[in-house]
Amino acid sequence: MVVATIKCVVVGDGAVGKTCLLISYTTNKFPSEYVPTVFDNYAVTVMIGDEPYTLGLFDTAGQEDYDRLRPLSYPQTDVFLVCFSVTSPASFENVARSGSRGTSPLPGVLLIVAPVTERGSSVREKLSKQKMSPVRKEDGERMAKDLGAVKYVECSALTQFKLKDVFDEAIVAALEPPAPKKKSHKCLVL
């Protein structure tokens, strides 16, 4: 029996939690230390109905040094998880900027994921010293809509809050991609 594969590529700035997201999901354990990724992949078998699927998870480096290497993982991707940290407004702006250039550099279905640590007072206090504040959920949802993403999900790799939801949504998005939006052709006669 041939098992169908769903390819899921995770992208976003360095140190926003991409690797933690994948390790926590695949092992049910939060990694104890930060190790910058160059490229890594994981595979898990998931059952959808009575059918087994291999969910291929491709972790990419977020550092600018790897901007030219990262696209090598994009071909045949079924779904992209685009990540930013709610405690890093710069990572949020980078996602918004990359999609506002007219066309997204990522083909296919996008699912915007915001690994949530906390928006608590200590985080707000730290960011306010830099004249910043945590990214609000409403802003994430708006950006996801503006970029044409199928969903915006906030989760925590540390506590596993909504972590499974992220990958369930990715699987659904890959198996049932949204219909492409029809371009309206308008004719204006003056």
UniProtKB/Swiss-Prot annotation:
GO cellular component: plasma membrane
GO terms assigned for molecular function: GTP binding; GTPase activity
GO terms for biological process, alphabetical: cell division; small GTPase-mediated signal transduction
Motif (Effector region): 34-42
Post-translational modification Cysteine methyl ester, affected residues: 187
Propiece residues: 188-190
Positions of GTP binding: 12-19, 59-63, 117-120
Predominant place of localization: membrane
Lipidation sites (S-geranylgeranyl cysteine): 187
Origin: domain of life: Eukaryota
Taxonomic lineage of the native organism: Eukaryota, Fungi, Dikarya, Ascomycota, Pezizomycotina
InterPro entries to which the protein is assigned, alphabetical: P-loop_NTPase (IPR027417), Small_GTP-bd (IPR005225), Small_GTPase (IPR001806), Small_GTPase_Rho (IPR003578)
Name of this protein: Cell division control protein 42 homolog
PANTHER family attached to this UniProt entry: RHO FAMILY GTPASE
Keyword hit for Cytoplasm: no
